[in-house]
Amino acid sequence: MLRFLVFASLVLYGHSTQDFPETNARVVGGAEARRNSWPSQISLQYLSGGSWYHTCGGTLIRRNWVMTAAHCVSSQMTFRVVVGDHNLSQNDGTEQYVSVQKIMVHPTWNSNNVAAGYDIALLRLAQSVTLNNYVQLAVLPQEGTILANNNPCYITGWGRTRTNGQLSQTLQQAYLPSVDYSICSSSSYWGSTVKTTMVCAGGDGVRSGCQGDSGGPLHCLVNGQYSVHGVTSFVSSMGCNVSKKPTVFTRVSAYISWMNNVIAYT
């Protein structure tokens, strides 16, 4: 939320015509996901005043490791991960709650420059979760994999369902086809803000991420199987669902080696 406030203050101080990247993305223009249809999706929650609050999404990649966005985490806060959840406001009977034991942010991440990339972090859980029909590990792409333009993808999360709207209590999904780097980095889209280590998806002005989905997965259908190709990173500060401003994700396939090393040696 701090990053949201930073960008909001830029708008308040007379920069409303500029297009800053806005982190903390959420699902806009989507629909409620079928219960537990995305079993690698997690809710990252922080402790405040004795209560837990959803702040970001994430992806279960090992029984005791979660992948999320670097801008979602802080060493000054206490976090937990909830797996197997669908409705955050009620007990579904399928949830597992696990404390975050260690936060590993990519060493090149710069919290003052989200557009530089490296918006990825791994969370080591205090204990391994139990895999079942409601909790599964994500399939990750091979290192270096690049999505074809217009590849079918879905974003999922509990974020806002419209710009400046309320958080969703039930998991939402929205169809966001991928946008090729050559298009997304063109001057009529994101320009030089987008890097080759990112994935763009959507941009139709209707469906997008928005504040609250950050850190969550972009599930893409490749060779008949859904795999997580993106970590939700930022949207336009002009609004979540702005035409030709696709939701931008950290490209998972650019960080496979880094993640494998962190997991092996941490």
Curated annotation (Swiss-Prot):
Pfam families: Trypsin. It catalyses: Hydrolysis of proteins, including elastin. Preferential cleavage: Ala-|-Xaa. SMART domains: Tryp_SPc (SM00020). One of its GO terms (molecular function) is metal ion binding. One of its GO terms (biological process) is inflammatory response. The active site is at H71 (charge relay system), D119 (charge relay system), S214 (charge relay system). Binds 1 Ca(2+) ion per subunit. Residues 17-26 form a propeptide. Keywords: Calcium, Disulfide bond, Hydrolase, Metal-binding, Protease, Secreted, Serine protease, Signal, Zymogen. GO terms for cellular component: extracellular space. Its cofactor is Ca(2+). Its EC number is 3.4.21.36. InterPro entries: Peptidase_S1_Elastase_sf, Peptidase_S1_PA, Peptidase_S1_PA_chymotrypsin, Peptidase_S1A, Trypsin_dom, TRYPSIN_HIS, TRYPSIN_SER. PANTHER family: CHYMOTRYPSIN-LIKE ELASTASE FAMILY MEMBER, CHYMOTRYPSIN-LIKE ELASTASE FAMILY MEMBER 1. This is Chymotrypsin-like elastase family member 1. It comes from Rattus norvegicus. The gene is Cela1.
